[in-house]
Swiss-Prot record:
One of its GO terms (cellular component) is cytosol. This is Polyamine aminopropyltransferase. Spermidine binds at H77, D101, D170, S171, T172, D173. It comes from the Bacteria. It comes from Thermotoga neapolitana (strain ATCC 49049 / DSM 4359 / NBRC 107923 / NS-E). S-methyl-5'-thioadenosine binds at Q46, E121, N152, G153. Keywords: Cytoplasm, Polyamine biosynthesis, Spermidine biosynthesis, Transferase. Homodimer or homotetramer. The active site is at D170. One of its GO terms (molecular function) is spermidine synthase activity.
């Protein structure tokens, strides 16, 4: 494993160092100016880069794919975490697979009902880097309710049966690192088995525009396992297309019929993106998405 070392480098005003991320087919992409390189290293699994952008703040990337930026990470983390958390009647035990930056854990821990939240991250160096450089998202690491496990999530979840109220999959891109292991039908079945009867599940399932293949495959596989499977969407400005998909699933809870907006209105923790109106609206899908999923 690569040791975590200081790699800060101030760039001179005339130095134009840019970060490029290419989307599907390498014909479209994202580029960001780097005014400070904070960390760059290679673990046994993936390349880790952390740098500063004048407008977006600290940017975190794995294998050349943007994971978080300080300015917009709340959009992704709130939608991934709070949709399932508010749908469960009393979430006490939560498993997060992936999400080594800590943002999803931070949001889960905003719920006072939570007694234990396990964050299972495959790459220990990501946890070290997040703890040191991603203060905004890793602030929940030392919460007494949090437990950090370094393990392959696809293998770890198989240890449990009827154990969790909520399982959240905060995976990397399926083509990077070991992210593909978290997109298999066998993995989704293991998550189903690890949930209690009233348990709920959510997963990031890529963008429904450039990554349409992975998006459709995830929905197809999840819906084979869970009797209730619904896609919902949210904005994510630095992810491909700006439109991001998530998939909610459960053994019996419906994300619209069983949603209680009053629980959200009474919530006394800060939410910058998610609210009761956004919850309902996020499940309204554009026609092109419905068509790809065979829903029209």
């Amino acid at each position: 494993m690569c040791e975590l070392k200081e790699l800060e480098r101030e760039l001179q005003p005339r130095q134009h160092l840019w970060y490029f991320e290419y989307y599907t087919g390498n014909n479209v992409g994202l580029f960001m100016k780097m005014n400070r390189v904070i960390y760059s290293g290679q673990s046994d699994i993936q390349r880790i880069d952390i740098f500063e952008n004048p407008d977006l703040g600290v940017v975190f990337a794995l294998d050349g794919i943007t994971m978080t930026t300080e300015k917009d990470e709340f959009m992704y983390h709130e939608m991934l975490a709070h949709v399932p958390m508010f749908l469960h009647p009393n979430p006490k035990k939560v498993l997060i697979i992936g999400g080594g930056d800590g943002g999803t854990l931070r949001e889960v821990l905003k719920h006072d009902s939570v007694e234990k939240a396990i964050l299972c991250e495959v790459d220990g160096l990501v946890i070290e880097a997040a703890r040191k450089y991603l203060k905004q998202t890793s602030c929940g690491f030392d919460d007494p309710r949090a437990e950090i496990v370094i393990a392959n999530g696809a293998e770890y979840v198989r240890k449990f049966k009827n154990e969790f109220d909520v399982i959240i999959i905060d995976s990397t891109d399926p083509t990077a690192g070991q992210g593909g292991h978290l997109f298999t039908e066998e993995f989704y079945q293991a998550c189903y088995d690890a949930l209690k009867e009233d348990g709920v599940f959510s997963a990031e399932t890529e963008d429904p525009f450039y990554d349409i293949g992975w998006f459709k495959l995830a929905y197809k596989r999840i819906s084979k396992v869970f009797p209730i499977t619904k896609v919902y969407l949210g904005f994510m400005t630095t992810y491909p297309s700006g439109m991001w998909s998530y998939t909610f699933a459960s053994k019996g809870i419906d994300p619209i019929k069983d949603f209680d907006p009053e629980k959200v209105r009474k919530f006394n923790k800060e939410l910058k993106y998610y609210n009761e109106e956004v919850h309902v609206a996020s499940f309204a899908l554009p026609n092109f998405v419905k068509k790809e999923l065979g829903l029209m």
